[in-house]
Amino acid sequence: ALFGTKDTTTAHSDYEIILEGGSSSWGQVKGRAKVNVPAAIPLLPTDCNIRIDAKPLDAQKGVVRFTTKIESVVDSVKNTLNVEVDIANETKDRRIAVGEGSLSVGDFSHSFSFEGQVVNMYYYRSDAVRRNIPNPIYMQGRQFHDILMKVPLDNNDLVDTWEGFQQSISGGGANFGDWIREFWFIGPAFAAINEGGQRISPIVVNSSNVEGGEKGPVGVTRWKFSHAGSGVVDSISRWTELFPVEQLNKPASIEGGFRSDSQGIEVKVDGNLPGVSRDAGGGLRRILNHPLIPLVHHGMVGKFNDFTVDTQLKIVLPKGYKIRYAAPQFRSQNLEEYRWSGGAYARWVEHVCKGGTGQFEVLYAQ
């Protein structure tokens, strides 16, 4: 949703995590979200389905076969991408990948194959992910989300707001904290709008690059708005944490769908994943930081005062297990089923959506 609208943007989302028993790190993750976007009606309705399968081929050498299938229909044109790739860790810092695939757009099709190596495997992880990882490795430093958007200049108030925002960045950021509190910058908005078939003119902002100081906005002291892809990488990094190769002792999968039309955006995700929980010591296990699957990382921009979030989370523990510590605190419990909604949880969700990296800590044991 683009700022400047008089209508309220509402994001509804429901998440469910079902954990396996014992010392297993596996779990099922389900997410559903629906966002009405009255200010950004797509001209081209989009329907996209994604499936990713990961299968271990040689556990000792860390060889994994990834199979990806993506199908989308944009303005009645069907597009497909199929890729199968075998990935192996040659050394601690070196990975090799060999694969093949095919791409089709309408009547056009193309097959391809590839072989590549990655040396010094640096990749970005958000602060939220970092808290679950003892020694994170970053790609391109400490990035935060992009500001990439198209803005319709509908009225003088919006023009003044936009010019003020640009000045606050180009002027060295003296007033940047005030602007960042007023608007929600969530994910690579330009990419989401552009790929969703939404063409909004007459102004296009391709990138902004600003770094925060010691006292950053909304409690975030280390942040950076950077060109091209940090929001996407953040989202991917959260999901890849759920795919630790050393735990991939059976096939894992993610299946998702994305729909956009004049009524808004719908996202659904179902996964069977090997990295949903981690050993926290002392007989405790930690559930990985709440993925917030579609809400935080898939390109929404909404005016702060007109953006509401309605999020629920359900976690189902193995039989005989109990939550020993939870922050934010759960709302209700029925045997091994725990639910979060409203209250401290809602405040935490809003904090994350405004760029915060507030604590989400759930520890459970028998």
Curated annotation (Swiss-Prot):
Gene Ontology MF term list: bacteriochlorophyll binding; metal ion binding
Binding site for bacteriochlorophyll a 3: 298
One GO-annotated biological process of the protein: photosynthesis
Coiled coil: none
Binding site for bacteriochlorophyll a 7: 297
Alphabetical list of InterPro entries matching this protein: BChl_A, Chl_A_sf
Gene3D superfamilies according to UniProt: Bacteriochlorophyll A
Binding site for bacteriochlorophyll a 6: 145
Binding site for bacteriochlorophyll a 4: 290
Residues where bacteriochlorophyll a 1 binds: 110
Keywords tagged on the record: Bacteriochlorophyll, Chlorophyll, Chromophore, Electron transport, Magnesium, Metal-binding, Photosynthesis, Reaction center, Transport
Entries under Pfam families matching the protein: BChl_A
Subunit annotation: Homotrimer. Each subunit contains 7 molecules of bacteriochlorophyll a.
Function in brief: Intermediary in the transfer of excitation energy from the chlorophyll to the reaction centers.
The protein, known as: Bacteriochlorophyll a protein
Source organism per UniProt: Prosthecochloris aestuarii
